[in-house]
Structures are given as C-alpha cells and as structure tokens.
C-alpha cells in the first residue's frame, strides 16, 4: 500500500553481488531485514551491515532475542505492525536519522572486531584457555 501511495520506494535487494547490495543499502533510508522468523531469530549480517552504515533497520526480534539483547537499536516489526511502523517513520525523518545513528554506535560497541576480540580474549583467559 505504501508504495502505491508513493510514500516509499521499495528496493528488494537479492540475487546481486555483495558490492551492489552494499551500494543499494547505502542509498536506503530504511532497511527491512527478517520478518516472520524464517531466517533465524532476530537479525543477521544484512542488519549488521545496514546498521554500520547508519541506516535505520527494521527486523523481527523474538522475545528470546529481546531479553538477550535488550539494548538493540532495531525497530522490532512483524507482519501485523510493519505498515504502521513504516508510516510512523515516513512521517518522522528525525527518528529515521536518530535510529540510524544509534545503530551505528551499537555496531561499533557490539560487533567491532577489537571489542569482540577483547571480550573473547577475556573469556578464554577466565576459563583457562590462555
């Protein structure tokens, strides 16, 4: 409905090279990843990439993921609320930008190679592997 109302331009990114996919994500204001729990529990590399680019990212986070990662920057959507959540964002450019910035900071904190390496090193050290 939103596309036919000319409120959004929908770009399905699939069956293209990684470099083309990255370029198209970079041009997005909003990125929608997994809805319907078909690709996993909550988010995947597509979402990490879009967040790292500062793109507002929507995905379906189940209750387990929400409790495990309560500080995530995703806008949690499902098939029932996707349209209404998109309408909220479309009418609030500042929220889109704020979510994008929050996502970028979150990826730097949770997925940056140095931070992950430090966490793993400390864990391995604590269990006697190092």
Residue ranges and their predicted role:
Residues 94-125:
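A charged, aromatic-enriched C-terminal amphipathic alpha-helix characteristic of glycosyltransferases
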């Amino acid at each position: 409905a939103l596309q036919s109302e000319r409120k959004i331009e929908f770009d399905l990114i699939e069956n293209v090279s990684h470099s083309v996919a990255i370029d198209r994500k970079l041009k997005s204001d909003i990125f929608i990843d997994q809805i319907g729990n078909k690709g996993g529990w909550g988010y995947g590399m597509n979402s990490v990439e879009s967040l790292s680019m500062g793109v507002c990212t929507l995905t379906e986070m189940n209750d387990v993921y929400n409790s495990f990662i309560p500080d995530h920057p995703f806008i949690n959507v499902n098939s029932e609320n996707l349209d209404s959540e998109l309408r909220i964002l479309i009418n609030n450019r500042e929220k889109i930008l704020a979510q994008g910035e929050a996502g970028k900071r979150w990826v730097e904190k949770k997925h940056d190679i140095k931070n992950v390496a430090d966490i793993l090193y400390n864990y391995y050290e604590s269990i006697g592997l190092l």
